[in-house]
């Protein structure tokens, strides 16, 4: 074996969405970082659907962006269609979604990586970890080259023991065209960590030249075109294109039902559990037998290819059945399949064996992020990657770890759910998972997180200057609206009265008027003049004003709960010795080893009464130690 001459502070294994964000985060924080990938050409590759964002997911993308990450800016540079989902609903559940050109997105990520100071990239698969006395010391590559670092972030995606299924045939692979990580999977199974198998899948890709779009429903992007990054602008976007909607039908369902015995999922060949919220088409037909059709979205893969991604018909059925399925769908009667769909099974590790920092509890300096933790989705992976990379850097600097709370970020919700509850199926983020979603909107991710990102060293001068200008702009505009008055029987007063449908009875300041449901910011400044030129400032002023009462109530609730949420539980606490706790709860707490009282309260089966007993125990323990010190 040969030792690489440079010693690193942090090594990141894997160049997908988790790995790239992890490596960039650590390097931005000033530590010497190595990104080890099996193929430099696939850095930032979108292995599944060509899209970023969506319900719950865009909140994560905006939080990554607020902390200086790359995903949102790469989306603005590679996005070929942008839409706001839930635009008619409240701001808490609105979400930005973008179709991305695979080539442009990947190029944007690679450009960011290659221009990041403190970051080295090396092409080699990782086969082994160097571990000494329960502390990671480095990694060993496929060719026996040893890289040394006391902090290693594993972001292996679907590569650990990856097994690809098409019909009843299967073969080893990390994804189509890439080898799996067999040696590393074997090495990780030797560690005292709980391991399981999960499964995900992808649909066949279609040649757009063989599709009849005229019989489908066109789905254009939104106008005006949204942006994903807080620093983004629509001028960055390439050419914008439409998606197309068609549907499965009775014939499609008959074909699938007649061939379920050839499905690896239904014949017992696949052991791993698939994603509940992104089921295969055979799973949909089986689980929702009463439905006569299912939507299929034809999504362009890019501007320089004819390939289409038929979102909604992920499948692992044999190729001959896939061809029948595709050609049974309206508009695709003569479609040509460019690549077959497939399912992939892979190893994941129980995230309950992780700390909030995403460091494993049993091996110091070893961090996990992405699908290795049981999640699904680029956005979930990127969020974990950024957090793991930042905490690996903090550890290298001898500083305390950091993780946002559930009331601070969707990243906090994601991590808390994973390490407290674990997961038996691929975990996907939804806004419904957050208790405080009115506070955790996608539009205010920067106001929630950028200041902390700056403190950690994640946020550069360009982003910080833009953030400060926005924050000051919001305060200035709110103050202006508060101090500007409209009186009855004036031209402005009459215009406002006409909008309300009733005369003004007394004078109002503009902030009071904006809080009324009948008027929005654009209409208000149309009447009174002096609009701000930053649309993000205008958006924040309007949301904060209209939802002030609800936001204040949620903030009060958060303040009440924060005391118990932040109460740390000692690492050496003996739950078996706490009288009053049932054996079941003692065992649950002993196994989970929660870090805070708040986390303990979310463990299934741990009752409010048990939390009260824990609090009493902590107070007794603290007073006992004070007596010892005074004696």
From Swiss-Prot:
A single Gene Ontology molecular function, please?
Answer: flavin adenine dinucleotide binding
Q: Please provide, in alphabetical order, the Gene Ontology terms of the cellular component aspect for this entry.
A: cytosol
Q: Where does FAD bind?
A: 14-19
Where does the UniProt annotation locate this protein?
Cytoplasm
Q: Origin, by domain of life?
A: Bacteria
Give the principal location in a single coarse category: cytoplasm
Going by the UniProt record, its keywords in alphabetical order are: Cytoplasm, FAD, Flavoprotein, NAD, tRNA processing
Coiled coil (UniProt feature): none
**Positions annotated to bind NAD(+):** 274-288
Gene3D superfamilies for this protein: FAD/NAD(P)-binding domain (3.50.50.60), GidA associated domain, C-terminal subdomain (1.10.150.570), tRNA uridine 5-carboxymethylaminomethyl modification enzyme MnmG/GidA (1.10.10.1800)
Among the Pfam families in the record, one is SAM_GIDA_C
What biological-process terms (Gene Ontology) are attached? tRNA methylation; tRNA wobble uridine modification
What cofactor(s) does the depicted protein rely on? FAD
- Statement: the UniProt record of this protein carries the keyword Flavoprotein: yes
What function does the entry list? NAD-binding protein involved in the addition of a carboxymethylaminomethyl (cmnm) group at the wobble position (U34) of certain tRNAs, forming tRNA-cmnm(5)s(2)U34.
Can you state the subunit structure given in the record? Homodimer. Heterotetramer of two MnmE and two MnmG subunits.
Q: Which family does it belong to?
A: Belongs to the MnmG family.
Q: What is this protein called?
A: tRNA uridine 5-carboxymethylaminomethyl modification enzyme MnmG
Q: Which gene encodes it?
A: mnmG
